Amino acid sequence: MIKIDNLKLSKENIDILSEYKIELTAIKLKKIDTTVESYIEDIYKYLEYIEEKKHIYSALNIKEEDIIDYLTYLDKNNYEKTSIVRKIVSIKLFHKYLSEKYHIEDISIKIDKPRVRRKLPNILSIEEVDNLLDIELNNAFDYRNKAMLELMYSSGLRVSELVDLKLKDIDLDNGYVKCFGKGNKERIVPVGELAVEYLKKYIYEYRDSMKKGYYTENIFLNNHGKKISRQGFFLIIKDIAKQKNIDKNITPHMLRHSFATHLLNNGADLRTIQEMLGHSSITTTQIYTNVSTDILKENYELYKRRD
């Protein structure tokens, strides 16, 4: 977390940034703290450049060409396009705030965000998923891992949604889970039969032995009897992939991407996938159509070589 009082900026810019942080925190109460911190860090780096390179010591005196110079500097120093876009959003929000608070011109109004081609998500083939999920079941931890992987692949949950699941959030008789996604938005997601089978096995036969005397509503527990963390699950899936000799840099999110792509390839419509993934916009979901097209092209090229 940035401590504004310790920043190497002019006193005026420190005061402006302090007031801006208070304003941001007030209007973004429903957002996580890291969102505000990210905005503030972006603006600190921006003002630091403006002071060092342009010798302008008040944000109120910045001109449009100064913003352009800063963005050019970022581009020349090989910042990722996505990072530059985020910084532009931060800068435009900051100058909009300055314009409204100090009744000055919004000099960022003509600054456009560059178009960024979204990177296609990495996915696993159905064979790789089957291999990953084919776990040897010898103890409570194996059954927990099996239940988590089956649930994630059959429902497309985010990792945070998976590890946050509580006993009251699941209806195994009807095959549904209730989860809370971005913005604490609730959605109900159907769960596959295999996932239900291994969830029942884990919860009814093994979970109690993992509690270590703690009481918790969280379904998935670590070896200390507490809620498993996102990082904990990340390490588990890495270890399983290594044991299975899967030659890919597997992350938990790849299961979510694979779930969506395999659904689409098997005829599911985008709206259904959007609802299951919890995307607020179908534009986000449409990225999977590009993945499917790429797979189709690869298969076509493969068959061409066989002619």
Residue spans for each PLM region:
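Conserved catalytic core of the tyrosine transesterase superfamily
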Residues: 1-307
